[in-house]
Amino acid sequence: MFMFSPEGKFLFQIGKNGRGPEEYLTIDDVCLSQDARELWILGGCEIVKYSTETGRFIRKTTLELPEICNGFDAIASGPGHSAFLYYCPQMDENNFSEDFYCLYRYDEQGRILQKFLPRKDYGLNIALITQTSDNRYILRPQDSDNICYYLSDSLPVPRVKIDFGKETIKNR
């Protein structure tokens, strides 16, 4: 991961790939902290944080995982250094025998604070969370839902409802 100025000048490297305490093993997604002073790298069950001003390592947090989850697909920063993490479970009919949530809010120590968006159907984990130019995050509609959510507050806030009327593809 590399940091460049708005003019395209190379500034510094941010972290490196590896198994060390200041390294990331994989990059599943990235986001900026709400104050944009930190870059957060999501790699499976860990968040590795680096300074956007110097590229220096800040901390690595191992996440407490829900029972069915084996790693997360997307990340967005939340208030007070919390993080929203999204998980799209594998397609398995047995997954619907128990309640399961797709969106979790974590504290800085990796503990679950809140759960949102009970899963209603199978989802595609493509472009789940989009960052806006003002460092807000938008979660695209999930499963059989037709709402886009902002993730900039402590709760997902419904922002846009998509309704194609009679042209909508029917749910199962």
For each predicted feature, which ranges?
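Hydrophobic beta-strand positions in blades of beta-propellers and related beta-sheet-rich domains
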Residues: M1-M3, I47-K49, Y101-L103, I147-C148
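Short coil/turn segments at the loop-to-beta-strand junctions that recur within blades
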Residues: G15-E22, T62-N70, R119-L124, D163-T168
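Asp-box/WD-like beta-propeller blade repeats and closely related beta-sheet repeat scaffolds
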Residues: L25-I27, L42-Y101, L113-D121
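Loop-centered beta-sheet repeat module
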Residues: S97-V157
